[in-house]
A protein has these predicted regions:
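Extracytoplasmic gate region of multi-pass secondary transporters
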Residues: 1-31, 120, 124
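Residue-level signature of mid-helix packing/kink "hotspots" within the transmembrane helices
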Residues: 26-34, 83, 114-118
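Helix-loop junctions at membrane interfaces in 12-TM secondary transporters
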Residues: 65-74
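Intracellular juxtamembrane helix-capping segments at the cytosolic ends
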Residues: 84-97
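A late C-terminal transmembrane helix in Major Facilitator Superfamily
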Residues: 97-131
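Multi-pass alpha-helical transporter architecture, strongest
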Residues: 142-160
Length: 160
């Protein structure tokens, strides 16, 4: 989310407007964290993850293709997805691997998540500097989310 305000600046928003729109992300993160727990209690968690990824893909692609016209809804679905993904990590690790080695497995998975989260702004910025636009980075992010959704679709049912 480091680049969200610069993305909005690139599509013509003022700094003040871009920061206000980025604030929507914070609200959506909270809602994502709250609602994903409710959802996974009722719906198979990988399906919830796929739905959340699909929403985020739509938000990212809409931002890439339509720019300022969709900034607020894009901010919302991206923020919602960010909030949901963090909670899904712990839930899915517990459901698929149990609690016997939960700390070790969760720690490794979350470390990988954090490394990717830390590197992505650097890569996004480098691509922006090389191309002069965020479009390629947004399309690449959407492609990675499509791959993630396909992987979630392959997950087996939980053991009882």
């Amino acid at each position: 989310m480091v680049h969200f305000v610069p993305i909005l600046l690139d599509v013509g928003f003022t700094t003040d407007a871009a920061v206000k729109i980025a604030g929507v992300i914070g609200i959506a993160v909270i809602l994502g964290r709250l609602l994903v727990g409710f959802a996974v209690d009722r719906i198979f968690a990988p399906r919830v993850a796929i739905a959340i990824l699909f929403a985020c893909i739509c938000g990212v692609l809409a931002l890439a293709l339509l720019g300022s016209a969709v900034a607020v809804p894009a901010a919302f679905v991206i923020g919602f997805s960010v909030g949901a993904e963090v909670d899904l990590i712990g839930y899915l690790v517990a459901r698929y691997f149990g609690i016997h080695a939960y700390g070790q497995i969760y720690g490794r998975q979350y470390s990988t998540f954090l490394i990717a989260t830390g590197l992505s702004p650097v890569i996004l910025g480098a691509v922006r500097d090389a191309t002069g636009t965020y479009t390629a980075s947004l399309f690449t992010a959407a492609a990675f989310m499509i791959v993630s959704a396909a992987l979630f679709a392959k997950l087996p049912k939980f053991k009882q």
